[in-house]
């Protein structure tokens, strides 16, 4: 089952629980990748809540959203850098991404092998990828009130296995969302305490697995997908050559009333 992009948007930006979840994940992300100065940063799935912090300092930031989910113009009011794509064929040149965030993607993938093959293809030498999936042992994967309760959850071992099969080397594990996935205000007031204690108490299980991985060179050499020479769509050519394109010019502050404030 694929969630609609507006449903996920509303969760993260228009609900108290979603805003708390966004803050928890971003806090972890800031400690994992505190600086992306001069780097090409790519997000796939619904990654825009976690990309904004990188807009000002990164060389380029692009958000890819799968066709099954839909797409939103983002960021508002700046020039759009989000693109609707086929999850099996990304319009990005091979090896030109330095940091990759996969969020709300693997658990909804129609072909996880093809998706991870594309992730491997676009990641450059020395690049890092962060895979975020619902924890099958956590409470969040069992709640229908959040996007984390949709799709297929993973255990850490299952995620590691998939990544190794597709040329990634799992390196660091992180967890987030120790708070209860409840919309009740009397329970939400305990969220900051639970998030703080969750990092210290091993018996508490986070609702989100965050796994940082690097790329093992040439592990899938000979793959027809990896070996194919594609040209990215015109809106993304600047990602490969560092030349700004009007659609993805993050320095363009021109406002548009049609864009959603996210």
Model-derived features with residue positions:
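C-terminal lobe and adjacent flexible extensions of AdoMet/dcAdoMet transferase-like proteins
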Residues: 195-262
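Hydrophobic beta-strand segment of the Class I
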Residues: 100-101
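Short alpha-helix
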Residues: 149-173, 177
């Amino acid at each position: 089952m694929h969630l609609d992009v507006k449903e996920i948007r509303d969760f993260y930006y228009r609900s108290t629980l979603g805003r708390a979840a966004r803050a928890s994940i971003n806090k972890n992300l800031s400690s994992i990748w505190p600086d992306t100065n001069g780097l090409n940063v790519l997000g796939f799935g619904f990654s825009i809540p976690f990309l904004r912090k990188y807009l000002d300092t990164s060389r380029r930031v692009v958000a890819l959203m799968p066709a099954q989910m839909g797409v939103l113009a983002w960021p508002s009011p700046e020039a759009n850098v989000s693109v609707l794509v086929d999850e099996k064929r990304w319009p990005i040149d091979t090896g030109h991404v330095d940091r990759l965030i996969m969020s709300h993607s693997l658990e909804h993938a129609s072909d996880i092998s093809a998706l991870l093959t594309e992730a491997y293809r676009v990641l450059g030498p020395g690049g890092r990828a962060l895979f975020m999936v619902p924890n099958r042992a956590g409470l969040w994967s069992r709640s229908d009130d959040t996007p984390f309760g949709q799709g297929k959850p993973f255990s850490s071992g299952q995620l590691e296995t998939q990544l190794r099969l597709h040329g990634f080397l799992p390196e660091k594990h992180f967890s987030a969302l120790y708070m209860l996935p409840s919309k009740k205000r009397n329970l939400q007031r305990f969220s900051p305490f639970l998030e703080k204690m969750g990092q210290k108490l091993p018996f508490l299980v986070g609702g989100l697995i965050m796994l940082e991985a690097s790329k093992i060179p040439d592990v899938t050499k000979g793959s027809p997908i990896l070996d194919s020479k594609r040209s990215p769509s015109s809106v993304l050519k600047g990602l490969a050559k560092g030349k700004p394109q009007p659609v993805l010019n993050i320095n363009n502050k021109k406002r548009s009333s049609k864009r959603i404030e996210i």
